[in-house]
Structure formats: structure tokens, C-alpha cells
Amino acid sequence: MIRILPLEQIKENGLTKNFYLRSIENDSHRELSEIIGSDYTVFESGKAAIRALIEDLKLTRNDEVLITTTTDTSFVSTCVSATIFNYCKISRILTENTKAIFIIHNFGFPHTGLKQLRLIADERMIPLIEDCAFGFDSYNDEGIRLGSIGDFSIYSLPKIFPIEYGGILSGKNHLKSRNSDEYLAKQIKEWVPKLWHIKKMRTSNYLLLFREFSRESIYKEAVEENPFVFGLCTYAYKEIEKMHNDVEFSRTHVINEIHIPVNAFAESMEYESLIVCLMQFAHSHANIKDK
């Protein structure tokens, strides 16, 4: 059984700040808890939630945390890798020194090895941690909710709601503080009832892009997923990045891939405008990669 340090000890260690939101002990709290699947603790950020959990696992410098991602590329967010590396080693392969398994559901797309990794974690009696920062209320093809297989799950509130900060640690044990954060309490209370609409609009905008560029899409059609980006495979990434000022692009994984954020609060006409630009560019240059 993994035990989380009491708040007083965490404060003494200067580890992080966490909040017990008394003022959302109501329908919003219960609804959020039902979606996440267990009681939860709210932190100042998702990274702070990771720090609190890794600190509690009491790993040594020779211990390793296996990090595995949906895309299985070399890229891992420094929010995860650098945070864990402050306490122990990180690895992309399973070894005799593996003391925890950390699954990253890239951009809300489910890791395909959930069940296998659960079995490995159980066999080794080590914790399985799911990073659902981009995958709130996403499900895999088997109807399994992301965050429900692991012993612990991590969420990032700004990636769920249009708010400034906040993270969630959910699991078998949780921290409660005598402190409260009224901003987070108010924001969660306001936005939790709108979760269904947020998910619906994000998926709708994703599907707008997918219908036009399914052949070039890095990821599959979203059915039960709640995708945070649309991935496009193209050799003309430099030109495409320059042609639409209203959408922020990123290239952090593979040089010929771009990721277009799927914003639940953006009008569909913005994505329709982007699609027109992409289609015009593809027709004129004929160099969108053919799969």
C-alpha cells in the first residue's frame, strides 16, 4: 500500500502547496469526483502533483521510473521527465531497477498497453501512474476511462477548463489541507457543469480537421477520446506554420509533424478557415505527405 505523506510533513519539506477546496463540497465536487473515479487533491499545478507523488514513493537515486507514451517517440515533456529526475532516474525500458511505471496519454489519446502495464505493475508490486493532463474524460476502444487503471492519475486543470492554474492528483490515497484556494474553488464550481459541452465542442473541432485530413492524420478518428490536438503529417511544416496567424502550431515530436491545438472555445469557423488554407496550400504545392 502506498501512503501519501501528511500535509504537515510536506510543508516541512518545502515540497509543494496543495489545496482542500471546502467550498466545492457540493454537486460540482461530487460530479468531478465521479468523472475522475476517486477522491482527489487539488494542487497549484499538475507538475506539483507529480512532485508530491514521487516524493511520497521515497525512491532513491538508483531507482528508475519507466516512462511510456502513446506515440512511443523519444520526446517526453520536461514537465514530467525533469520533475521525476530530481528524485530518481528515468528510463524508457523496463529494468530490474524499475520502481514505478508512468504512462503518458499523449494529447488525450489512450496508451494501447494499459492492461499489459497493469499486469506488469501488479506482478512487480509497483505503482502504475497515469498522466491524464491532456486526457480528461477520455476513453479507449474498450471503454476504459483514462486514469481508472492506474493506482494514481495526474490532471492539469488549465488543460480542462479555461483557468490560470491548478492540478489534480487522484488515487487510492489523497491529501487534504486546512488551506483553501477560493479562485480554484470558484472556477471548478463554475466549469464542472459545463464539462460535457467542453468535451463535445473539442471533439467537434477535432473531427472538422479529421474529416478533411484523415489520410494525413497522425491519430485516429476520435470516438470516445477527448483529443487536445490534431496531428498532421506533412513535409511542408515550415510554410504551413506561417500561413495562419490565429492558430498556434507546435513541432516537438517529429520534424515532419505539426500539432494543431483543438480549442473547445474556438468557433468552428476558425477551423474551417484553417482547413481552407491547408487545402489551398496542399493543392498548390502538392506536398502534403501521402500515407
Where are these regions (language model features)?
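Conserved PLP-binding active-site segment in aminotransferase class I/II-type PLP enzymes
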Residues: 1-45, 52, 56-60, 96, ...
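Conserved glycine-rich beta-strand-loop-beta hairpin in the small C-terminal domain of fold type I
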Residues: 5, 9-19, 189-192, 199, ...
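Conserved PLP-binding active-site segment of the aspartate aminotransferase-like
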Residues: 231-235, 250-277
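Glycine-centered flexible beta-alpha turn that most often forms the glycine-rich phosphate-binding loop
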Residues: 131, 240-244
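Active-site PLP attachment segment
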Residues: 148-179
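Generic structural signal for small/hydrophobic residues in well-ordered secondary structure
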Residues: 49, 65, 105, 131, ...
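PLP-dependent aminotransferase-like
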Residues: 27-34, 39, 44-123, 127-137
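Short, solvent-exposed loop/turn segments at secondary-structure junctions
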Residues: 47-49, 71-73, 106-109, 134-136, ...
